[in-house]
């Protein structure tokens, strides 16, 4: 499981001309799921996302978490995070999980993240053509991969 976390001032996702979800200060998370991902991967990522301290304290030091600032989170499914580009110039997404695996894991991630955050996270629509708008804050962008827990 891979995520890209972007610290944002605000973000939204629009599908077919209609805003599905929007947030103010917090995280926009792009979530990629591969075939061997599990509930354990979700639990690890949720703990990391909730505990991550990348918001400034009163001294301008990144020392506050999403919980400390009462922030919001928008989660967008993003199979392209598992692009393979070893051969040729057109990427392949063979490592990305199929819908029957990825949809339940995406939903579980969002549910567990909402529970940990104490409020509903915003979501896109799995498999839809989405227009995602965001205003990066910093910018601060962090990548996490459950297969490489550094």
What are these regions (language model features)?
Residues 93:
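Glycine-rich, phosphate-binding/catalytic loops in enzymes
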Residues 1-89, 97, 103-150:
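N-terminal, polar/charged subdomain of small-to-medium soluble alpha/beta proteins
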């Amino acid at each position: 499981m891979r995520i890209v976390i972007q610290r944002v001032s605000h973000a939204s996702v629009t599908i077919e001309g209609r805003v599905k979800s929007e947030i103010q200060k917090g995280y926009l998370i792009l979530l990629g799921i591969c075939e061997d991902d599990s509930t354990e991967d979700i639990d690890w990522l949720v703990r990391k996302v909730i505990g991550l301290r990348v918001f400034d304290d009163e001294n301008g030091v990144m020392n506050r978490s999403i919980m400390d600032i009462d922030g919001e989170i928008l989660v967008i499914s993003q199979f392209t995070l598992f692009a393979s580009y070893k051969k040729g110039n057109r990427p392949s997404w063979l490592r990305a999980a199929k819908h029957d695996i990825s949809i339940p894991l995406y939903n579980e991630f969002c549910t567990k993240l909402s529970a940990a955050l104490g409020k509903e996270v915003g979501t896109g629509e799995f498999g839809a053509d989405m227009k995602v708008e965001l205003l990066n804050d910093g910018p601060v962008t962090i990548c996490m991969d459950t297969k490489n827990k550094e």
